[in-house]
């Protein structure tokens, strides 16, 4: 976890944290750093960064649940970026992501392992069990999550979410 009060990492980059920044949840600490680098070049700011590693104790779903249950519309970031290697509890992800979106949040996510090569890479990295790509697509669509396929796309979509709505 990294936020305005705690930086529990040993590598760079460590971004400056801002209350109005993006919440970022990653299934991989190393991949999180690559995504942070991409985001910083676009001027994207962070409110918090969470890495759940191989999700043996908690996964992306539990962090989303925590954010949903404790959401403060005045103080909390309304933009969430997710890098997911496996979805262990799709119902939990659907419920809490949908709830956050109804509360005014925007969520963009990469689901790693959408190709055969990607499935092997995710499995060898964290032991992730591959989810069906069509099931992931349906889950994201139903929840309202914007699906991305690269770190550049993820950080670009999150950057777009930060723009003020044109009326």
Language model: regions and residue ranges:
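Catalytic-core regions of core metabolic enzymes
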Residues: 1-167
């Amino acid at each position: 976890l990294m936020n305005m009060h705690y930086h529990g990492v040993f590598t760079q980059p460590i971004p400056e944290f801002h209350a109005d920044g993006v919440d970022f949840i990653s299934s991989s600490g190393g991949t999180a750093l690559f995504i942070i680098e991409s985001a910083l070049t676009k001027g994207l700011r962070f409110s918090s960064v969470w890495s759940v590693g191989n999700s043996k104790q908690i996964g992306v779903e539990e962090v989303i649940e925590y954010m949903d249950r404790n959401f403060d519309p005045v103080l909390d970031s309304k933009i969430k970026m997710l890098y997911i290697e496996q979805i262990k509890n799709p119902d939990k992800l659907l419920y809490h992501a949908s709830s956050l979106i109804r509360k005014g949040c925007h969520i963009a996510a990469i689901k790693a392992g959408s190709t055969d090569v990607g499935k092997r890479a995710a499995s060898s990295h964290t032991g992730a069990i591959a989810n069906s790509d069509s099931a992931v697509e349906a889950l994201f669509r139903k929840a309202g999550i914007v699906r991305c396929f690269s770190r550049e796309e993820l950080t670009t979509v999150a950057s777009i979410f930060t723009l003020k709505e044109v009326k």
